[in-house]
Curated annotation (Swiss-Prot):
This is Ribosome hibernation promotion factor. Required for dimerization of active 70S ribosomes into 100S ribosomes in stationary phase; 100S ribosomes are translationally inactive and sometimes present during exponential growth. CDD domains: RaiA (cd00552). It is found in: Cytoplasm. Disulfide bonds: none annotated.
Length: 191
C-alpha cells in the first residue's frame, strides 16, 4: 500500500518512521486492493498521562466508506503497531462483508462502513471474530429536518444531551454535528 499522506504534528517524521509505517500498513494489502487513499498523522502531545503522549491516526478510504483507527501509546512505534492491528481487524470484517454480498449476488461495490472509529480504550477486540458480528437495529427514529446553522445544531444537541445531531444546513444540505473526545465539536457534511 502506498501512503498518500503521512504527516507529523509536533514531531518530525523521519525516514525510519516512514518506512515502519509503510511496512505495517503494507500488511493490509492482503485484505483488499480497494483502498483508494491512505492518510496517516503522527502526533506527539504534552500530556500528563505518558501512555497517551503519542497518537497515531490512520484513515483509509475504501469504496462506500472510511475505515479509521486512532491509537495512543507512550512509544510511537507501539502506537503504530496498535493502529495497524485495529485496521487489520476492520479490513477483515470489510472483506468478509464484501465476499458475503458477492456470494449473495448483490451489486458491487460493497457499501463499506460509514466510519469505523476505534480508540485505545476500545481497540475493537469485540470484532476479532468477524463471523459473529451481526448488528441489530433495535430502534428507528424519523423526524423532520429543520434548516439551521451548525452552531444552532450544537445548541440543540446539547439541549437533548446527545453526542450527535442530524440537521439541515441553511443551504439545504444534510449535516451532522458531534461531540469529539477532546471536548470540541465536529461537523460532517456531504460534498
Amino acid at each position: 500500500m502506498q501512503i498518500y499522506q503521512l504527516s507529523g504534528r509536533n514531531v518530525e517524521v523521519t525516514e525510519p518512521m516512514r518506512e515502519y509505517v509503510e511496512e505495517k500498513l503494507s500488511r493490509l494489502d492482503r485484505y483488499t486492493d480497494q483502498i483508494t487513499d491512505a492518510r496517516v498523522t503522527l502526533t506527539v502531545r504534552d500530556v500528563r498521562n505518558n501512555e497517551r503522549r503519542n497518537r497515531v491516526e490512520v484513515q483509509l478510504n475504501v469504496p462506500g466508506g472510511i475505515i479509521r483507527a486512532e491509537e495512543h501509546h507512550a512509544d510511537m512505534y507501539a502506537a503504530i503497531d496498535k493502529a495497524s492491528d485495529v485496521l487489520e481487524r476492520q479490513l477483515r470484517k470489510f472483506k468478509t462483508r464484501y465476499m458475503k454480498q458477492r456470494q449473495e449476488g448483490r451489486p458491487e461495490p460493497l457499501p463499506g462502513p460509514a466510519e469505523a472509529e476505534v480508540n485505545a480504550q476500545g481497540s475493537g477486540a469485540a470484532m476479532d471474530d468477524v463471523s459473529e458480528f451481526h448488528p441489530e437495529i433495535v430502534r428507528q427514529k424519523r423526524f423532520e429536518l429543520r434548516p439551521m446553522s451548525a452552531e444552532d445544531a450544537v445548541v440543540q444537541m446539547e439541549a437533548l444531551g446527545h453526542d450527535f445531531y442530524v440537521f439541515q444546513d441553511l443551504q439545504g444540505q444534510t449535516g451532522v454535528v458531534y461531540r469529539r473526545r477532546d471536548g470540541h465539536y465536529g461537523l460532517i457534511g456531504s460534498s
